[in-house]
Amino acid sequence: MQNSNKILQALGIPYTALLSVIFGLLLVSFPIGIFVVFESDVGGDINFDYPLTHLELFHGTELYLMPTDISIGDAFVVLWTFYAILFTISAIGPKHGFFKSLSSVISFGKSEYQSNYMVGITKWLSILILISVLINFIQEGFGIETIPPLDDNDLIQFFYVSLAPLIEEFGFRLLLIGIPLFALYSSKSSPKYFLRCLWRPANLDIFDSKKAILLIVFVGVLFGFAHIAFGDSWSEGKFAQASAGGIILGWVYLRYGFVASLLVHWATNYFVFSYATFISQINF
């Protein structure tokens, strides 16, 4: 038992180092995102003053092309602030800070995954990225390409990838997983308890996880299909990648709650795009 604990402690050193590096990169991505939107020329002939209602997002509604003082930069700052607040909350709680939680892995060879949200976020973000890369590598070997939807402007695309996690996590995790889980496993019916379980399904007494796992897999596949189902969507190669990502996000939601799944999703979008755009601007 003692030898086993020493092995876990030894493995804990590279493990905590990896999570610490990812945490640092996520932290730095916040100012990088601000630079990309407000200081770079990624938008070409438009910039952060572009009216929000001119986005194709509002096409077909009464808001489309309506005169407004709200710009894409204003909306981005609201999203940025929202994610920054959640990031801070995740780094300091719910019980211990990020680095204090990691220190227990090195000191005692064990990790209490519920002590800090950021530990779970960085761990599952690593897993999600690794699986996505593997799927992409395998599919390319069979000639299956993963082509993103075409957008004429990178600034608008950056705004969309920042907004998408909030919309998709609300729809696919809160509504399609959270509510059915409550219906399956809840022993109470109070509104307060419902909201607590929706926010963090671990509050439910999930005595038989088979139904929960099947639900997560089903919604994950649905999530993958949603990425290729429309005319301006990703190519078919995105289906497997998005389905795997949807299943992982569903598991993160079940185990850690909505904040964790939202931030993992945000990181895969905002984090990757901000660094890629920043590097391209430097090279340019």
Regions found by a protein language model. Name each.
Residues 43-47, 62-73, 93-171, 175-206:
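Juxtamembrane helix-loop-helix connectors linking adjacent transmembrane helices
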Residues 1-118, 273-284:
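N-terminal, membrane-interfacial amphipathic/helix-forming hydrophobic leader that caps
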Residues 34, 125-147, 217-235:
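Alpha-helical transmembrane segments and their membrane-interface junctions
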